[in-house]
């Protein structure tokens, strides 16, 4: 804006204002962006066509684009900008000129200054180190690399995982992780000087290949000196009682001083007090360096509070989920002692519902002495999903999936779009080269306001992958009740009514493999009772915990139907972490079962047990463990089976794990025949990769003990499924 003054002939003062409109952006263009589209880069900036033109804003956006490239591993990227103004219409075109510079691939990460970590391991050297390395209390370069997200480039694999590219923000976070690692091993004065970190490009023919050299000076290792307590006067909180926690976290005299273990100790003692209602108890650790010994003496000071009781429950943020759905998950009730331990259990239960993005439980002050409210703050999450998926396996071939789920369903509340009651609803359809499936499921987790779940499943499956000689269709409905009967043990009572159709049966297997009575349609009316205890830390990739399940089925007889059988099956799994480096995990999985017909009826072919393939005996073809028909080599199955598998896996780098395994099992024709003389066994190696939230498994299995009929040499098993 410009202003001019003038005086007319009459002596009046005239002021003229000239308004110059601010330039507006006519278009935003990108040049040189070979690896990322303009639409993708536009999401990173604030300048857009039609917005006011700001040179400061454009410069800021150029920096944002450069930061985005660096985040994606293009650390040599350069971004400049230019503005082409049009004086006539007051517009300007913004052009971002990008020199991507190629991505930097990390060839080696080298540690200097600490002799223990200077030895380097290649890709296969890491595997050997993980599997056959000595169990030492000290650490080496593999342990440091396990702490870092930054990793070396591995052909093919790095293209899938995006590991091996240099990303500045990740690397800076990794340096802090290394400092923390050393401090937690007692090296409180460790020096990792950013100015001494070197980025070397030794190969002139490959300018994007880089070595990282990190200089580490550990300095003195501190150990725990004398441990004492102060202020713990309440009965039941003696020095001897609290010393149990000190011992648990390895902070007794002579052990390495670890700041993170000290923090855990503080939290544990505070929670121990809070478990008995002493909610406001303050716990702090005083560190006193001992000049004479070079150790750190610890004084655990406790400022004890009064005992508090729970007054009321205050829920905030549940705009969609009913309050009663939240309250029924709580392990605390008004009038009880305010137990911090049970408060944490309640918080975990609410998180496990997956109804909320954020869940926070905390004590809240009241104006009543020794009374506190329980404040529950939640942030509603997205519980409905429409997912499309694709999968492939050596058994089922290619499969496409579409699924609609609502994890917080409410069939009676259309005003909130059928959400908020904590019910489960799912519709799933799959179509593939060898199988098709449709399933509709509903579950009410609290029937009559009791912790008793009711559910119903309607389904239809068509399968051709069981055999090349026949096809199978199942159409059915299952109703079930499920209840937690003790801590993590739950019982499930189910009734299933199913129609099974065996069709397209090849003439070669009629009668000798599949009895004529089993061909065509048959109904199954079955009651099942099962017990399950599951303590795994993850359903997708478990690293610790157990899973125990017992299943009993009875079909026919007074339940009617055309199938009379009794079946019992037991399943067990155990996962245990062994060493921290590489996040190594050992697992044992076993299954066994038997089925028998009654009332003069045999067990139908489609209800027998089978073993073999990528889901159990990985060194054998699908279903080829047990007796085969001598003419067609079609598996006959059996009425008794047992199977066990041992697997040891180690993380090479996130998200790739390497595994070695051993499988053993048998299938016997008769019911209740656990004679293992005809067992088969195999061993092998494999990889586990978590991509886009779904596991990919690649296994090579080699038969160890096999019969003449099923020794087909090495077996390749592959499976992968995801949603997008």
Q: Where do the model's predicted regions map?
A:
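Conserved active-site loop/cleft motifs that coordinate metal ions or position small ligands
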Residues: 101, 658-661, 695-701
């Amino acid at each position: 804006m410009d202003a001019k003054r003038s005086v007319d002939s009459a002596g009046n003062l005239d002021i003229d204002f000239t308004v110059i409109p601010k330039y507006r952006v006519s278009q935003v263009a990108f040049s040189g962006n070979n690896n990322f589209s303009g639409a993708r880069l536009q999401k990173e900036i604030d300048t857009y066509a039609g917005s006011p033109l700001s040179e400061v804003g454009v410069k800021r956006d150029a920096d944002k684009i450069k930061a985005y490239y660096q985040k994606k591993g293009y650390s040599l990227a350069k971004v400049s900008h230019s503005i082409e103004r049009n004086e006539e219409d007051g517009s300007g075109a913004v052009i971002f000129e990008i020199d991507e510079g190629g991505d930097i691939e990390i060839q080696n990460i080298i540690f200097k200054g600490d002799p223990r970590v200077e030895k380097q391991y290649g890709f296969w050297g890491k595997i050997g180190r993980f599997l056959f390395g000595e169990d030492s209390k000290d650490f080496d370069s593999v342990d440091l690399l396990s702490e870092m997200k930054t990793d070396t480039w591995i052909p093919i694999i790095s293209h899938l995982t995006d590991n091996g590219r240099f990303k500045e923000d990740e690397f800076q976070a990794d340096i802090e992780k290394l400092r923390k690692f050393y401090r937690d091993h007692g090296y409180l004065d460790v020096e990792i000087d950013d100015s001494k970190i070197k980025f070397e490009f030794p190969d002139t023919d490959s300018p994007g290949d880089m070595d990282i050299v990190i200089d580490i000076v550990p300095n003195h290792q501190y150990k725990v000196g004398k441990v004492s307590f102060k202020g713990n006067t309440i009965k039941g909180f003696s020095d001897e009682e609290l010393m149990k926690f000190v011992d648990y976290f390895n902070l007794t005299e002579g052990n390495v001083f670890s700041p993170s273990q000290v923090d855990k100790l503080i939290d544990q003692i505070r929670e121990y007090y809070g478990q008995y209602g002493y909610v406001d108890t303050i716990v702090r650790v005083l560190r006193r360096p001992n000049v004479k010994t070079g150790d750190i003496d610890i004084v655990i000071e406790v400022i004890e509070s009064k005992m508090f009781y729970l007054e009321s429950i205050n829920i905030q943020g549940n705009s969609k989920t009913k309050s009663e759905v939240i309250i029924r998950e709580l392990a605390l009730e008004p009038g009880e002692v305010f137990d911090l331990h049970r408060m944490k259990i309640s918080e975990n239960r609410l998180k496990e519902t997956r109804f909320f993005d954020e869940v926070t439980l905390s004590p809240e002050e009241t104006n009543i002495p020794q009374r506190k409210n329980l404040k529950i703050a939640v942030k509603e999450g997205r519980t409905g999903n429409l997912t499309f998926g694709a999968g492939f396996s050596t058994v089922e071939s290619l499969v496409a999936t579409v699924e609609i789920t609502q994890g917080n369903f409410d069939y009676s509340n259309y005003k909130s779009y059928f959400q908020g009651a904590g019910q489960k609803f799912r519709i799933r359809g799959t179509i593939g080269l060898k199988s098709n499936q449709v399933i509709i499921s509903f579950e009410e987790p609290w029937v009559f306001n009791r912790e008793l779940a009711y559910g119903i499943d309607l389904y239809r499956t068509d399968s051709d992958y069981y055999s090349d000689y026949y096809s199978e269709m199942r159409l059915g409905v299952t109703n079930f009740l499920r209840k937690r009967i003790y801590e993590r043990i739950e019982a499930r009572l189910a009734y299933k009514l199913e129609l099974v159709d065996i069709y397209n049966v090849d003439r070669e297997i009629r009668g000798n493999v599949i009895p004529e009575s089993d061909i065509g349609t048959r109904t199954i009316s079955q009651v099942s009772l099962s017990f399950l205890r599951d303590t795994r830390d993850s359903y997708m990739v478990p690293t610790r915990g157990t899973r125990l399940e017992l299943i009993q089925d009875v079909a026919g007889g007074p339940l009617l139907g055309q199938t009379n059988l009794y079946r019992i099956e037991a399943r067990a799994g155990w996962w245990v972490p062994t060493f921290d480096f590489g996040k190594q995990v050992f697992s044992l999985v076993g299954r066994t079962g038997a089925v028998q017909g009654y009332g003069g009826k045999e067990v139908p072919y489609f209800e027998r047990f089978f073993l073999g393939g990528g889901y159990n005996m990985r060194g054998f073809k699908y279903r080829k463990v047990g007796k085969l028909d001598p003419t067609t080599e079609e598996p006959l199955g059996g009425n008794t089976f047992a199977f066990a598998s041992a697997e040891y896996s180690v993380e090479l780098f996130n998200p790739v794990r390497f595994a070695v395994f051993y499988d053993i099992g048998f299938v016997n024709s008769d019911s209740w025949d656990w004679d293992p003389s005809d067992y088969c066994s195999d061993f092998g190696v494999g990889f586990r990769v978590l991509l886009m939230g779904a596991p990919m498994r690649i296994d090579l299995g080699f038969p160890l003990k096999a019969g003449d009929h099923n020794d087909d040499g090495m077996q390749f098993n592959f499976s992968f499924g995801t949603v997008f």
